[in-house]
Amino acid sequence: MTKKITKIIILVILSAVIIFEVGYIINRNILNDNTSNSTIEITPEPIPVVGRDDENDDAKEKSKIIVIDPGHGKPSSLMSDEEKQSSGWVQNSDGDWGEWRHYKSGSATENCEGSGCNGRVPTNGACWYPIANGDRSKESDINIRNAMAAKRHLEAMGYTVRMTRNSNNENPSITKRLSYCYPNNDMTKSPDARLFISIHSNASGGESRGVAYISAKDPYDQAWITADYSKLSNELGSLCTKQIDEISSLSIYGNGEITWEPELITFCKSPVPCGYLEIGFFDNSSDFAILNSENEIIGEGVAKGVDEFCKTH
């Protein structure tokens, strides 16, 4: 009986060992088959491209160079011929001093000399602009004081300012003034200025008062300007006018826009948007007092208008 039980136990143990071995072999074969038929895919990390510039032109930092033009200057009667020539004035076929209102269409360097331009001129005006037409007495000094104040405020805001004149002993032509929109006044190069601000004061018989801007109106056809040149020029002029009205004692003249002088040489030749400001009426006693006492405030208004424009365009 004992022997029989012992045999049974041995058989059970042997059976268990056989079952274990068979199971191990089957599992090993299955594992080997799965391993040999499978692949492991590794997705590599993207390699960064060093130095690639994905920014488009509009996203790049725009110029912070502002050209400020204090209108008028030294009376032409006090200028020698050499001085006129060095200041950008030219002589026409009659030997008279002045400058041409336009460039040849599409140019930024070739004066029209009466043809090859869009021909836009003021009422009773012409392509030729005599030097004496720009002579002023009181206004020149008012303009440069307001312009210098604007320069100080703009520089404090981080802008680079180029002045078209720095004293009342200078009277560059408009063409020469606009050359400051270019690096080193080199008009064969691309303009590097952002904006051109022309600062003037008005006169109208002593009754009118206030600040306004002269608006541009298409068509203009000089080189470098964009399709929205007039629109941008008018937005710039409007912003400066509103800021001066807001912080100074000057009020707005009319609705703040003077619409009847879009043929100004500045508009016809500037390569960049141009704000053309008429700040107060110097022949009105109340405005004249403000113009003599609030230059710093007026300059701040101009600077704030420029800064607002640059931050929104």
For the regions a language model picked out, list residue spans one by one.
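Catalytic-site microenvironment of enzymes
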Residues: 2-313
